[in-house]
Amino acid sequence: MVLMKTPICNFGEKAIDFNLPGTDGKQWSLDDCVGEKGTLLMFICNHCPYVKSIQTRLIDDVLKLMDIGINSVAIMSNDPDDYPEDSFENMQKVAAEYNFPFPYLIDESQEIAKAYGAICTPDFFGYNAALELQYRGRLDDSGMKPPSNNSKHDLLEAMIDVANTGNGPKHQIPSMGCSIKWKNSA
């Protein structure tokens, strides 16, 4: 497991369209996922201990964001041939087990992860209503540990600002996680 950190937010960068299959059997595009006040696009997977440790907290925050007009979508771009736990069938199981309140999509070609510049799981891209990037940071300050009563909810707070003002915070702390497992181009 290689620990990676996300780069700084490239404020204003436009979201890139996609057309990917979801664990629900539907094809999803960016337009299908857009929220009235913003959109949270997340690169996650099933096997990464960083993602596993935040799963419940992430869902809690996504539900709060839905209440204020921000929709979320998760994309899995790892190579399932090398990481079978990230197979589409296992994605379906995880989505059902946690009752994901967002589409969980597979990027089998890895083209979408490359287009977005995603580097790790989790990697969060928070967009305003105009689909301009405003947040590229961590979920919270707990990392892989259980949150304390005074934990800072970076993602939630940033996306509330995005919903209210269209702008994310200037100071953002990178997300940390496992590197995306790229296919060998042999």
What residue spans do the PLM features occupy?
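Chalcogenol-based redox active-site neighborhoods
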Residues: 1-164, 168-172, 179, 186
